[in-house]
A protein has these predicted regions:
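Low-complexity, acidic/polar, glycine-enriched regions of mature
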Residues: 1-184
Length: 184
């Protein structure tokens, strides 16, 4: 079986995010000298492509209780009230408010809700093309990035460093690798 890749324009219709092939990752500066990287599971999402790009929309749901950074102690701490408070805020969402072209790429603007706080963010989005997988599914791939202030989402936990500065940067880079399947 082969996979056919044809970088074409998206066709209008509804596309479901394939959660097993979609990843939401983040990185944040740690102690001012290195980065901590992690991911959170995407549990659902839909991309609706309109005949007119302005009629398009994106919605994504994430589960913060799945956070993983490669360190079980840190992951456990991130789930507590010091950070994500997953008992109280068990779901994060992104719902687009506009989609437009920026040269050959897209800009998706929308409301991101983390920790019970909703803020408008802009995702710089690259369309990677479409492919028909061995099972006959038409797939579209995207990569998107944005940078947020964790303080703006009520994530204020930190510790001062002896030499000055803080343990955890306010700036968090979020990246999404998306595979969406065209619905009949």
């Amino acid at each position: 079986m082969t996979t056919t890749t044809t970088p074409t324009e998206l066709t209008a219709g509804t596309w479901a995010l394939d959660t097993s092939h979609t990843e939401a990752a983040f990185s944040v500066r740690h102690a001012g000298i290195s980065k901590v990287r992690g991911s959170v599971a995407v549990t659902g999402g839909t991309l609706v492509v309109g005949d007119d790009l302005a009629a398009s929309s994106v919605s994504v749901t994430l589960d913060p209780s799945t956070v993983t950074t490669g360190d079980a102690n840190r992951d456990g701490h991130l789930k507590t009230g010091d950070f994500f408070d997953v008992e109280k805020f068990g779901e994060w969402t992104f719902v687009s408010t506009s989609v437009h072209h920026d040269g050959s790429d897209y800009v998706v603007v929308g409301d991101l809700t983390i920790h019970g706080v909703t803020k408008s963010v802009e995702l710089a989005t690259e369309f990677n093309g479409t492919a028909v997988d061995p099972f006959g599914n038409v797939r579209a791939g995207f990569e998107a990035t944005t940078t947020i202030s964790r303080k703006e989402f009520g994530l204020t936990y930190n510790a001062a460093l002896e030499a000055g500065g803080v343990l955890i940067s306010d700036k968090v880079v979020i990246s999404l690798d998306v595979s969406a399947i065209k619905q009949a």
